[in-house]
Every structure is written in C-alpha cells, then in structure tokens.
C-alpha cells in the first residue's frame, strides 16, 4: 500500500510507482478520492465569505483530475471514488461540479487529453446504495450516490458520495446494492 497526496507528487512519480506496484496486473481496484476542501460546505462557505473570486480560482477544484489521470494511465478494472456530500451542490463558473466529474469519470482518457489516443476506455458508473431514481435514459440522479452511513450499521450520521465505476469492457451486470441494516 502507498499513501500519496495527489497533486503534491509529480504525475510521473505517481505513474511509475503505480506501474511498479501493479507488476503487470490486469485486474485491480483503485480506491480513493480527491481532497474535499473545495467541496465541503464548511470549506466553501469560508472561502466564498472571504472572496468569491478566490474561491473560483482555487486549484483544489481540479484535483479530481489527478484521479482521472490514474484511471486513464492504468485502466483499473473497478474504481471506488469517495467524497463529501457537499460535492453535490458545488458549482464552478455556474456549472455543477458533480455532473462534470461524473462525465469525466465515464471517459477519463477523453477528459484528460481531449482524445482517446487509441484507448477505448470508458466506465459504467453506479451508486452502491440506491437505484431507479434516474431519468428515462437510466442515468443516475446525483443524490443516488449519497451513502448514509447510519443506514448500514455504522454508528455515525456521516453522509458520503461513493461512486463505483466498472470498466465497460468487463462489465457484465449491475452490482448488488448495499443492504440496509439495523442501526447501531
């Protein structure tokens, strides 16, 4: 295991370290998430209160692209990305940050380079806690990705966004949902 702060380590170092760790493995899972300060309600209100222009220019809005780069470079079979619930309401230049992240996660090579560069890489995205509230095209509603930990036996009321991505070329069927358990 390696704990790295994406955005602080150089991309070449991250790429080399992951390649070495994978040792040619074709089936693996990436678990992690970008820093949440730019998306958390507390962080946003503090920054917007100080200076809205400063908030709009905060480079932490784009740290999720470091995660995308790992997806594009290493093509994990499955990924699990976690972040704070405040991401659902975060906006940058009047655009939903969450919807942009979802679109980018579906096609990380395209998002990172503007082209697939011969890589046909795409992911199907899933909620692990809810299904069926999306539109006619079976696209999930952003709220579907919120996991309410207290509904799954965890003794705290912490709500998190969790996105499960399965590489399209290995996708067979939708994953099972978490089962609600008795509260602790």
Task: Briefly describe each language-model feature range.
Residues 1-27, 99, 103-110:
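Glycine-rich phosphate-binding loop and adjoining beta1-alpha1-beta2 segment
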Residues 20-21, 42-184:
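Class I S-adenosyl-L-methionine
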Residues 26-29, 78:
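Structural motif
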Residues 30-31, 151:
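Short glycine/serine/threonine-biased micro-segments
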Residues 31-33, 164:
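Structural recognition of the conserved hydrophobic beta-strand(s) that form the central parallel beta-sheet
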Residues 33-34, 75:
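Hydrophobic alpha-helix-in-membranes signature
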Residues 37:
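Active-site beta-alpha loop architecture of Rossmann-like, nucleotide-cofactor-dependent enzymes
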């Amino acid at each position: 295991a390696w704990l790295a702060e994406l955005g602080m380590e150089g991309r070449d170092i991250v790429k080399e370290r992951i390649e070495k760790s994978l040792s040619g493995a074709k089936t693996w899972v990436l678990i992690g998430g970008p820093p949440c300060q730019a998306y958390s309600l507390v962080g946003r209100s503090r920054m917007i209160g100080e200076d809205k222009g400063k908030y709009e220019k905060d480079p932490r809005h784009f740290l999720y692209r470091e995660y995308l780069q790992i997806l594009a470079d290493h093509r994990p079979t499955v990924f699990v990305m976690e972040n704070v619930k405040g991401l659902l309401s975060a906006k940058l230049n009047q655009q939903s940050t969450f919807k942009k992240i979802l679109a980018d996660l579906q096609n990380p090579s395209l998002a990172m380079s503007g082209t697939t560069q011969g890589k046909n890489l795409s992911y199907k995205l899933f909620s692990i806690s809810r299904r069926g509230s999306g539109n006619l095209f079976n696209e999930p509603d952003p709220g579907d990705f919120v996991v309410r930990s207290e509904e799954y036996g965890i003794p705290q009321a912490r709500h998190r966004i969790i996105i499960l991505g399965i590489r399209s070329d290995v996708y067979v069927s939708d994953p099972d949902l978490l089962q609600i358990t008795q509260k602790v």
